[in-house]
């Protein structure tokens, strides 16, 4: 990819995302454009300090491992139980198509994120894991599925 972003909250950062340009292809006046459109936080160096620490000694990857492994377990369970994954995402985010009765039943116990209506009777929902997701929480969700 020419550009992508790295989320911080999945690994415990207070807030923020890092935009990464991979081929020395940062658009001309990129920082100025961000400032002019209100997308640059005051005291943004605090955000940078988090990522500086997270990118040292592979800390980001070490912390993210839990979120990604938890998401992988949930993806496997969804497939095994016949759910349709909307697309494959090798991250801590899972996008799954569900009917409304299933969503209603699950939302009595867990928080799902609405993504979009797939059709008249199905909705694409988002399930996220994080550095703090426990194996017990994953087991509970799998049982609910």
What annotation goes with each model-predicted range?
Residues 1-91:
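Active-site C-terminal subdomain of aminotransferase-like
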Residues 72, 77-145:
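Conserved C-terminal alpha-helix-loop-beta "cap" of PLP-dependent enzymes
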């Amino acid at each position: 990819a020419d550009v992508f972003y790295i989320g911080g909250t999945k690994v415990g950062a207070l807030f923020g995302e890092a935009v990464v340009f991979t081929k020395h292809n940062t658009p001309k006046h990129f920082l100025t454009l961000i400032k002019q459109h209100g997308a640059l936080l005051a005291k943004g160096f605090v955000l940078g300090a988090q990522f500086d620490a997270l990118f040292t000694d592979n800390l980001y990857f070490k912390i993210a491992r839990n979120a990604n492994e938890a998401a992988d377990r949930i993806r496997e369970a969804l497939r095994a139980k016949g759910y349709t994954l909307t697309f494959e995402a090798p991250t801590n985010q899972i996008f799954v198509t569900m009917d409304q009765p299933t969503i209603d039943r699950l939302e009595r116990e867990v928080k799902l994120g609405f993504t979009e209506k797939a059709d008249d009777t199905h909705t694409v929902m988002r399930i996220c894991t994080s550095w703090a997701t426990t194996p017990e929480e994953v087991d509970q969700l799998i049982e609910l599925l």
